[in-house]
Amino acid sequence: MSENKTSLSYKDAGVDIDAGNQLVERIKSVTKKTHRPEVKGNLGGFGALCELPTKYKKPLLVSGTDGVGTKLRVAMDANRHDGVGIDLVAMCVNDLIVQGAEPLFFLDYYATGKLDVDVAASVVTGIGAGCEQAGCALIGGETAEMPGMYHDGDYDIAGFCVGVVEADNVIDGTNVKPGQKLIALGSSGPHSNGYSLVRKIIEVSGADVNAELNGKPIIDQLLEPTRIYVKSVLALLEEVQVSAISHITGGGFWENIPRVLPEDAKVVIDEKSWEWPAVFSWLQENGNVTRHEMYRTFNCGVGLVIVVDDADTEQAVNILKQHGENAWVIGDIASKDGEEQVEINA
C-alpha cells in the first residue's frame, strides 16, 4: 500500500462549505427585513421557532409547499434569477390565502450542482422580497450543493409556508350558491405555470424572445414575477364575507375553479369581461394553441377568482382596487346542469 496517498477533502468532491457559509452571511440581512414578532431565535439554528399570533382565538395552521417549475429554465437561460424567488413565495402564499389564512413563516430549499454564491444570493433576495410582500417571515432554509446531481449552473428551488386562520373563518366553498358573483384579480403574466409549453412554443416557432411586444421585451413579460395577493385579500376578508377563492395555477380554469365548488354548482364566465394580456395571445398564436388548451394551461390574465354575494360585489371590487388590484366581475355561480363545472362564454 502506497504511503503517498492524496488527502481528499469535501471541496475536492465538489462541495464548498466555505461558499455555503458565505451565502448564509449574505442573506442574514434579507431575513431580518421579513421578521415578525412571533419568530423567536436567529437564523442558523437547527430549527426555527415561531409562536402563534395572540389575536387568534381558535387558530388553525394551514401549510403548503410548491416550486417554480420550468420557469427556472427560462430564468437560467436568460441569466436572470431575482424574480424566481418572488415566484416561489407567491406560489405558496397564494395557495394559503385562498383558505383565508394569513402566512406566518416561510422556508426554502435550494439545490444545485455547484454553488454560485451570487446566483443563490439573488434568488434568496427575491424570496425575501416575496416574503415582505406577503407579510411572512423567512425563518430558515436549506442549501444543498450536490455535484453529479445537477449540471453546475443549474439549480432547483422549493418553498414551504405555514399560515394561520381562525377556525370559524376557513374559506372552503361550502357557502357557494347560485346567484353569487365571481370577481377576477388580474395576473402579472403566466405566473409560474405552463412554462414547459412556453418553452416548446419558443423552440418550435423560433420566436425571438428579446423582441418587443406592446413596448416590452417578451422575455421580460415571461419572467415577470407571480403576483402576490395576500395583503389585498386579507383586507377584503376584513370587510366582506367571501364564499370561495380559487388560485388559477397548473390546470388553469378547468381544473382549479371546480376545486372550490360544491358538486351541484358551476361557474359561468363571461370571456368578454376582460382582454387577455398580450403575452397570452402571443403564445396562442406562435404555438397554434387551442382556446381550450390555453384555459387549461395558463391563467390567461386571471390570477385569482373570488366568490361573493351579489350584494357585496361592488364593495369587494372597490376594496381590491384600493389595494392595488385590477379587479372586475368575471361571471356568476349557477346550478350545475351537466358534467362540466366551468362554462366560458365567448
From Swiss-Prot:
GO terms for biological process: 'de novo' IMP biosynthetic process; adenine biosynthetic process. InterPro entries: PurM-like_C_dom, PurM-like_C_sf, PurM-like_N, PurM-like_N_sf, PurM_cligase. It is found in: Cytoplasm. It comes from the Bacteria. It catalyses: 2-formamido-N(1)-(5-O-phospho-beta-D-ribosyl)acetamidine + ATP = 5-amino-1-(5-phospho-beta-D-ribosyl)imidazole + ADP + phosphate + H(+). Its EC number is 6.3.3.1. Keywords: ATP-binding, Cytoplasm, Ligase, Nucleotide-binding, Purine biosynthesis. Pathway: Purine metabolism; IMP biosynthesis via de novo pathway; 5-amino-1-(5-phospho-D-ribosyl)imidazole from N(2)-formyl-N(1)-(5-phospho-D-ribosyl)glycinamide: step 2/2. GO terms for molecular function: ATP binding; phosphoribosylamine-glycine ligase activity; phosphoribosylformylglycinamidine cyclo-ligase activity. The keyword Transcription does not apply. Gene3D superfamilies: PurM-like C-terminal domain, PurM-like, N-terminal domain. Pfam families: AIRS (PF00586), AIRS_C (PF02769). It is an enzyme of class 6 (ligase). GO terms for cellular component: cytosol. PANTHER family: TRIFUNCTIONAL PURINE BIOSYNTHETIC PROTEIN ADENOSINE-3, TRIFUNCTIONAL PURINE BIOSYNTHETIC PROTEIN ADENOSINE-3-RELATED. NCBIfam families: purM (TIGR00878). Belongs to the AIR synthase family. This is Phosphoribosylformylglycinamidine cyclo-ligase. It comes from Alteromonas mediterranea (strain DSM 17117 / CIP 110805 / LMG 28347 / Deep ecotype).
